[in-house]
């Protein structure tokens, strides 16, 4: 049975919700799924004053965890059109895994959130996907089998490169059911691919 890691960073809970949806989809495909988060780099007093969501249940991942999975789906909010520094810092520590080819052939994917529709969703996904490709992974996006990413009757995230959500400038907008459905669809597709490749 394929093992899937949903690895995320979420300051305000939007990506945490998307991570749970990705995991639901992967489980639906028959995979064993773990959800883990990367360490917070912001000092605790600053995080509290900034109203970060500090009660997230997912355990903190280690770099060596990555080698134990057939698929890794990475999610993080956008910071100025790229992944958050917390995720970047974590992935920057994976040089040892890269050097020994420990991630070659594993399945990977990306998901993100932005404050606005044009806040850098695709560039953030690319910043994650670039890492996955350097690690030698097989990247699976959000294919057009999920047709709701092309809806025009509502504000909705989603791109062929990965599931996304739009939070609003003040962060008050939570992922819509359409966006969560996209995350579930991508999680299921990634797990199905991992099962085909790794059993």
Curated annotation (Swiss-Prot):
GO terms for MF: flavin adenine dinucleotide binding; FMN binding; NAD binding; NADH:ubiquinone reductase (non-electrogenic) activity; NADP binding; NADPH dehydrogenase (quinone) activity
Keyword vocabulary terms for this entry: Flavoprotein, FMN, NAD, NADP, Nucleotide-binding, Oxidoreductase
Taxonomy, superkingdom: Bacteria
Pfam families per record: FMN_red
InterPro entries (UniProt xref): Flavodoxin/NO_synth, Flavoprotein-like_sf, Flavoprotein_WrbA-like, FMN_Rdtase-like_dom, NQO
Enzyme class: oxidoreductase
CC cofactor note: Binds 1 FMN per monomer.
Protein name (database record): NAD(P)H dehydrogenase (quinone)
């Amino acid at each position: 049975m394929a093992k899937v890691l949903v690895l995320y960073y979420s300051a305000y809970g939007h990506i945490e919700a998307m991570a749970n949806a990705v995991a639901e989809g992967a489980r639906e495909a028959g995979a064993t799924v773990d959800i883990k988060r990367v360490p917070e780099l912001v000092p605790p007093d600053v995080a509290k004053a900034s109203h970060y969501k500090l009660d997230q249940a997912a355990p903190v991942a280690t770099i060596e965890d990555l080698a134990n999975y057939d698929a890794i789906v990475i999610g993080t909010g956008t910071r100025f059109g790229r992944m958050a520094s917390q995720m970047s810092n974590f992935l920057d520590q994976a040089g040892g895994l890269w050097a020994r080819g420990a991630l070659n052939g594993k399945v990977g994917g990306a998901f993100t959130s932005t404050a606005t529709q044009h806040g850098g969703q695709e560039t953030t996904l690319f910043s994650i996907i670039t890492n996955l490709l350097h690690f030698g992974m097989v990247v699976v996006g959000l294919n057009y089998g999920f047709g709701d990413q092309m809806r025009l009757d509502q504000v909705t995230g989603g791109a062929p490169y990965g599931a996304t959500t739009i939070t609003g400038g003040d962060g008050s907008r939570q992922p819509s059911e359409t966006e969560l459905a996209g995350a579930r669809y991508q999680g299921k597709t990634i797990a199905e691919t991992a099962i085909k490749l790794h059993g």
